Amino acid sequence: MANLRVEVISLFPEMFSAISEYGITSRAVKQGLLQLTCWNPRDYTTDRHHTVDDRPFGGGPGMVMKIKPLEDALVQARNAAGEGAKVIYLSPQGRQLNQSAVRELANEDALILIAGRYEGIDERFIDAHVDEEWSIGDYVLSGGELPAMVLIDAVTRLLPGALGHVDSAEEDSFTDGLLDCPHYTRPEVYADQRVPDVLLSGNHAHIRRWRLQQSLGRTYERRADLLESRSLSGEEKKLLEEYLRERDDS
């Protein structure tokens, strides 16, 4: 049995081969940790043109996805996922997805993701069936498929056994509310730039301290808003003060 079932309702199910055939998400599918199924609303139309959209009432540009094909696809997705599955619409009107939300979604047994197209979907479908709306940022995309894939990838990383190293998910950026620290690999010197000595020292306590300090400093410089919602420990405050002092002195 999969740790997580994800049912996707999309006019372009082929796009989700990026999830099922590549990288960490592909491995999770092969290991049975993630079960991914796509449902195309076109398969639930009755006219010869397989019409899934129509002009918006009130006029305006573009087309709107019709209710009935979406509802019929949702019935099949619910039958597969179970009645308790959370229905999520990927939408620029939704709350912005963050790591805290991803952690909550990773605790679900099943998710049904609605990937809209055109100018969006009929609001009556949202009112009747959607539990949550999520956005991946304040910019415009051509459809909900890419946001759905972002959500699936982020959630899959948190499934037990999905990553190659047990600590990888816990050490990712944002997991503890901070940006990630710098990473280095061989060679030790490249174009006269050396790997920081502390990473070659073998002293795990010093390495942990350095990485935490770098994460704090990067977050302060690049995403200070993240620190506003995070309570720093005494050690973290001291490390950040040292980082800023060394930066200003250099």
UniProtKB/Swiss-Prot annotation:
InterPro entries named among the record's database cross-references: Alpha/beta_knot_MTases, tRNA_m1G_MeTrfase_C_sf, tRNA_m1G_MeTrfase_TrmD, tRNA_m1G_MTases_N, tRNA_MeTrfase_TRMD/TRM10
Pfam families: tRNA_m1G_MT
EC number in record: 2.1.1.228
Gene3D superfamilies: 3.40.1280.10, tRNA(m1g37)methyltransferase, domain 2
Catalytic activity: guanosine(37) in tRNA + S-adenosyl-L-methionine = N(1)-methylguanosine(37) in tRNA + S-adenosyl-L-homocysteine + H(+)
Record's subcellular location: Cytoplasm
Signal peptide: none
Residues involved in S-adenosyl-L-methionine binding: 116, 136-141
GO molecular function: tRNA (guanine(37)-N1)-methyltransferase activity
Major subcellular site: cytoplasm
Any one Gene Ontology BP term: tRNA N1-guanine methylation
Organism superkingdom: Bacteria
Keyword annotations: Cytoplasm, Methyltransferase, S-adenosyl-L-methionine, Transferase, tRNA processing
Annotated Gene Ontology cellular component terms: cytosol
Annotated NCBIfam families: PRK00026.1, trmD
Subunit structure: Homodimer.
UniProt function note: Specifically methylates guanosine-37 in various tRNAs.
Family (UniProt): Belongs to the RNA methyltransferase TrmD family.
Name of the protein in question: tRNA (guanine-N(1)-)-methyltransferase
Organism name: Pseudomonas fluorescens (strain ATCC BAA-477 / NRRL B-23932 / Pf-5)
Species classification: Bacteria, Pseudomonadati, Pseudomonadota, Gammaproteobacteria, Pseudomonadales
